[in-house]
Amino acid sequence: MTKSELIERLCAEQTHLSAKEVEDAVKDILEHMASTLESGDRIEIRGFGSFSLHYREPRVGRNPKTGDKVELEGKYVPHFKPGKELRERVNLG
């Protein structure tokens, strides 16, 4: 599901809200989540899961085109860990 598909589905379910209100709400939620992760904080949504940052150690990679070794710097990457309820729901469906 894309962001625009999510907005369309929410508009269909929440008929008392305008499409612009739904779009703004979705964009605000995603922006708040991104800025929370950017500041190094964790996001926990009970029953759904948690978002956090994991550190990837510096390593030696390869250029896929030439095969040359390339030094890759360490970096933080977003990580999602599904909650128990979400895992169970996915496994039943």
From Swiss-Prot:
Domain of life: Bacteria
GO annotations of cellular component type: chromosome; cytosol
Single GO BP term: regulation of translation
Keyword Transcription regulation: yes
GO molecular function, one term: DNA binding
Keywords for this protein: DNA recombination, DNA-binding, Transcription, Transcription regulation, Translation regulation
Transcription regulation among keywords: yes
Subunit (UniProt): Heterodimer of an alpha and a beta chain.
Function, as annotated: This protein is one of the two subunits of integration host factor, a specific DNA-binding protein that functions in genetic recombination as well as in transcriptional and translational control.
Family that this chain belongs to: Belongs to the bacterial histone-like protein family.
Name of the protein in its database record: Integration host factor subunit beta
Organism this protein belongs to: Vibrio parahaemolyticus serotype O3:K6 (strain RIMD 2210633)
Upper taxonomic lineage: Bacteria, Pseudomonadati, Pseudomonadota, Gammaproteobacteria, Vibrionales
